């Protein structure tokens, strides 16, 4: 069966493994975008680490969970957001101000919404984690 949204599948796999109390989870298929999103999650302390595993079929990521994820998900459709509108989207997807992150694809790469606000740039919303 074809995967329609591999980013949403990966985020729900991570959330379900965290809810089950697992220490690590395998996420497939791997992509550069998913790797960049995992890097942002690691920089913000939501996962302990991740590594790429080449299985000859597109690859996988082995993600070490830190147990700090309450909820995570993909944002679909990927809304374009200006820097001035970041606070509106933060209130839509995060439970409180400065609690959790929005993952944004910008011209400077995939970064958190706080970094995008500091840089003064907008982008497209990819996901949220808190």
From Swiss-Prot:
<dbReference type="InterPro" id="IPR000630">
    <property type="entry name" value="Ribosomal_uS8"/>
</dbReference>
<dbReference type="InterPro" id="IPR035987">
    <property type="entry name" value="Ribosomal_uS8_sf"/>
</dbReference>
<keyword id="KW-0689">Ribosomal protein</keyword>
<dbReference type="InterPro" id="IPR047863">
    <property type="entry name" value="Ribosomal_uS8_CS"/>
</dbReference>
<comment type="function">
    <text>One of the primary rRNA binding proteins, it binds directly to 16S rRNA central domain where it helps coordinate assembly of the platform of the 30S subunit.</text>
</comment>
<dbReference type="GO" id="GO:0005840">
    <property type="term" value="C:ribosome"/>
</dbReference>
<dbReference type="GO" id="GO:0003735">
    <property type="term" value="F:structural constituent of ribosome"/>
</dbReference>
<keyword id="KW-0694">RNA-binding</keyword>
<comment type="similarity">
    <text>Belongs to the universal ribosomal protein uS8 family.</text>
</comment>
<protein>
    <recommendedName>
        <fullName>Small ribosomal subunit protein uS8</fullName>
    </recommendedName>
</protein>
<dbReference type="GO" id="GO:0019843">
    <property type="term" value="F:rRNA binding"/>
</dbReference>
<keyword id="KW-0699">rRNA-binding</keyword>
<dbReference type="GO" id="GO:1990904">
    <property type="term" value="C:ribonucleoprotein complex"/>
</dbReference>
<comment type="subunit">
    <text>Part of the 30S ribosomal subunit.</text>
</comment>
<keyword id="KW-0687">Ribonucleoprotein</keyword>
<dbReference type="Pfam" id="PF00410">
    <property type="entry name" value="Ribosomal_S8"/>
</dbReference>
<dbReference type="GO" id="GO:0006412">
    <property type="term" value="P:translation"/>
</dbReference>
